[in-house]
Amino acid sequence: MKALKIPEATITRLSIYSRFLKRLDKKGITTVSSGDIAEGVGVSPAQVRKDLAYFGEFGTRGVGYNVKDLIRYTVKILGLSDPWNLVMVGAGNLGSALVTYREFKDRGFSIVGVFDNDLTKIGKRIADMEVLPLEELSRVVKEHNVRIGIIAVPSKAAQDIADIMVKAGLEALLNFAPISLNLPDDVEVRNVDLSVKLEILTFNLALKEK
């Protein structure tokens, strides 16, 4: 299986399926159909089957999928069989919220270091974490085998911070700054621009009024 041939939308839905399946498992449900999954996450049964077919054959026709088995498969496909350590640069309001975001831990992600270059923030604590100076980034990345970093700084600082993070050895960045980053091709970057998501909502609402 070559990951590059898998549509990113499929990976996104796979994560949603995995989360839904874990909720079913907590309720004691042992078997689920593609129709059940589709209804639970808001897609068609055909879409569920198509997404899963990228990765092999799952389930039994007429019976459905074993919930625990499908959870195990999706977790493995998403690379979540082992926990992932993260670092974050930016100890402002957004960074503080992300540190305490419970879903990270529930999904196997652990923030092991928070950094800032603002002297008024360095040394302070966010939840149970002390904010460290950027000079400590490389050390923490190496000590905790960190491959993924989160950028939670203003857009004017994002490119410089991204360069520092890549130099420290990070291979993938989740960027919350509303700016496109110029980085080497082998660095994975995903941008999260909340204003864009809001503009999609306003577009759809405006469309309804026409």
Curated annotation (Swiss-Prot):
Localization recorded for this chain is: Cytoplasm
Predominant localisation class: cytoplasm
Q: Name one GO cellular component term.
A: cytoplasm
Residue stretches spanning the membrane: none
Q: Where is the signal peptide?
A: none
Q: A Gene Ontology biological process annotation?
A: negative regulation of DNA-templated transcription
Q: Which Pfam families match?
A: CoA_binding, Put_DNA-bind_N
Q: Which residues bind DNA?
A: 16-55
Instruction: Fetch the InterPro entries from UniProt.
Output: CoA-bd, NAD(P)-bd_dom_sf, Rex_DNA-bd_C_dom, Tscrpt_rep_Rex, WH-like_DNA-bd_sf, WH_DNA-bd_sf
Swiss-Prot/TrEMBL keywords? Cytoplasm, DNA-binding, NAD, Repressor, Transcription, Transcription regulation
Q: Kindly list the positions annotated as binding NAD(+).
A: 90-95
DNA-binding among keywords: yes
The answer to whether the entry has keyword Electron transport is no
A GO molecular function held by the record? DNA binding
The record's comment on protein family reads:
Belongs to the transcriptional regulatory Rex family.
Matching HAMAP family: Rex (MF_01131)
Q: State its role.
A: Modulates transcription in response to changes in cellular NADH/NAD(+) redox state.
**How would you summarize the oligomeric state and partners of this protein?**
Homodimer.
Q: Which protein is depicted?
A: Redox-sensing transcriptional repressor Rex
Q: Which gene encodes it?
A: rex
